[in-house]
């Protein structure tokens, strides 16, 4: 990609973040105005306080982004470890094929390889489940909003 396109995309994303945060600030100022007017008139401000404390869109969005970021980082770390295991599994496969030529070790070698294969299958199943749940929880939710 061209550097100009990348900078354009980054600036557009920054502008959208700016608009999102700015919009929440405007909503916050409007809530403060409503609370001030209601308090001045002696009306109940509990409902407006609950909007600030419990239903702050900015706080909820930041919590989602934080959870998404932490989960993404953890998923990336797991993928790095999985690549290491894949390399180890490939090396084990090559060692197994090499040692299969030695007649006395053949059964022991194949049992080890079979155990590693079962482990790798379980690892791949759990990997696909984790990515599916991650996609369902974060990616689909972010794209629908």
From Swiss-Prot:
Keywords attached to this entry: Cell membrane, Membrane, Transmembrane, Transmembrane helix
Compartment(s) of residence: Cell membrane
Main localization category: membrane
One GO location term (cellular component): plasma membrane
UniProt membrane topology term: Multi-pass membrane protein
Superkingdom per UniProt: Archaea
Transmembrane segments: 3-23, 83-103, 105-125
Protein name as it appears in the record: Uncharacterized protein MJ1354
Organism the protein comes from: Methanocaldococcus jannaschii (strain ATCC 43067 / DSM 2661 / JAL-1 / JCM 10045 / NBRC 100440)
């Amino acid at each position: 990609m061209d550097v100009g396109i990348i900078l354009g995309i980054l600036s557009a994303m920054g502008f959208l973040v700016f608009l999102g945060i700015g919009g929440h600030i405007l909503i916050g100022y409007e809530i403060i105005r409503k609370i001030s007017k209601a308090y001045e008139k002696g009306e109940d401000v509990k409902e407006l306080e609950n909007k600030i404390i419990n239903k702050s869109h900015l706080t909820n969005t930041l919590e989602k982004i934080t959870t998404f970021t932490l989960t993404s980082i953890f998923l990336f770390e797991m993928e790095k470890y999985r690549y290491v295991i894949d390399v180890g599994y490939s090396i084990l496969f090559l060692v197994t094929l090499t040692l299969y030529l030695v007649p006395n070790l053949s059964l022991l070698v194949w049992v080890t390889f079979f155990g590693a294969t079962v482990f790798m299958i379980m690892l791949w199943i759990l990997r696909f489940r984790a990515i599916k749940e991650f996609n369902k929880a974060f990616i689909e939710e972010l794209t629908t909003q």
